[in-house]
Amino acid sequence: MIKKISWILFVTLAIIIGLYPGIYFLIPREFGLLSSKKPELLNSILWNIGFYTHIILGGLALLIGWIQFSSKIRARNIRLHKQVGKLYLTAVFLSSIAGIYIGFYATGGIVSSMGFISLGIIWFCTTLMAYLHIRNKQIKQHQKMMIYSYAACFAAVTLRIWLPILIMIFGDFNKAYVIVAWLCWVPNLLVAKLITRRLSELGFI
């Protein structure tokens, strides 16, 4: 029962936050994270391309990535698994590169920037490794790297959980954002490590 509830919560959060970028097209640009950006940055064509590429394709990756972990879906339709995988890979590669670029302009300065840039690099590299493993038919290694990849992707969810909590604790958005730049993904990777270790012990991967 606990496992089922955890899975439902996991999928629900992935879907909700995966659809979240659509809000940026429905409300004024002063909303949310954009309210902390300087006008000259918001008027930059290159930055806007990077920002919207990152949030749209990152949202897509989050929205469809969980499907790959469903053994039932994979068993029933391996073709769907492969097609979703290709779409996920494409979305991640473009979103992570865009994320690395906009990371240089992150609110909170160099510490915040390094956090998000590191996340972008790790997301790109783990996904690339997952792709190379499956190309070489190394299924277990592929599965492990995909867990790490989606753990990095899930940072979009954990960021939105931690940020309001940190703002309430510190009473300052900038301070909270510097912390969340690391807190949104480092614990995720630690959890991914525990999951892959446990699955390896059970012989699943």
Model-identified regions with their sequence ranges:
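Alpha-helical membrane insertion/targeting regions
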Residues: M1-I205
